[in-house]
Amino acid sequence: MELIEQVSVAKKANIYFEGKVASRSVFFSDGSKKTLGVVLPGEYEFSTSQGEIMQVTSGSFEVLLPNSTTWQTFSEGSQFELAANVSFKIRNNAIAEYCCSYL
């Protein structure tokens, strides 16, 4: 199991899509932040307010990236990058997890 050490974690979860997507904010001493999330099966659309790197930590997602018409599969250990102020879609058939790093 990969660990993130010496951080502060928000007690309250970020809940989206009627509880089908949940994440926790993790704060580092240098001021940076990541979110660790769990996504139940479904299809969801998200928007970014800043650049992000999404790493799949468990399971897999199909992702429709901005300005694309083709869904791409990202499995455990893979990642994709998003610019600020864009929308993207993800879908999955089984529970999946992610770690989002903000740029």
Swiss-Prot record:
**Catalyses which reaction?**
a purine D-ribonucleoside + phosphate = a purine nucleobase + alpha-D-ribose 1-phosphate; adenosine + phosphate = alpha-D-ribose 1-phosphate + adenine; cytidine + phosphate = cytosine + alpha-D-ribose 1-phosphate; guanosine + phosphate = alpha-D-ribose 1-phosphate + guanine
Instruction: Answer yes or no on keyword Kinase.
Output: no
Which top-rank group of organisms is this from? Bacteria
Q: Does the keyword Glycosyltransferase apply?
A: yes
A Pfam family this chain is assigned to:
Ppnp
In short, the EC number is: 2.4.2.1, 2.4.2.2
GO cellular component terms, alphabetically, are:
cytosol
InterPro entries according to UniProt: Ppnp (IPR009664), RmlC-like_jellyroll (IPR014710), RmlC_Cupin_sf (IPR011051)
Protein keywords: Glycosyltransferase, Transferase
Q: Which GO terms describe its molecular function?
A: guanosine phosphorylase activity; purine-nucleoside phosphorylase activity; thymidine phosphorylase activity; uridine phosphorylase activity
Broadest EC class?
transferase
Concerning PANTHER family, the annotation shows: PYRIMIDINE/PURINE NUCLEOSIDE PHOSPHORYLASE, PYRIMIDINE_PURINE NUCLEOSIDE PHOSPHORYLASE
Q: Which family does it belong to?
A: Belongs to the nucleoside phosphorylase PpnP family.
Q: What does this protein do?
A: Catalyzes the phosphorolysis of diverse nucleosides, yielding D-ribose 1-phosphate and the respective free bases. Can use uridine, adenosine, guanosine, cytidine, thymidine, inosine and xanthosine as substrates. Also catalyzes the reverse reactions.
The name under which this protein is listed is Pyrimidine/purine nucleoside phosphorylase
Native source species: Shewanella sp. (strain ANA-3)
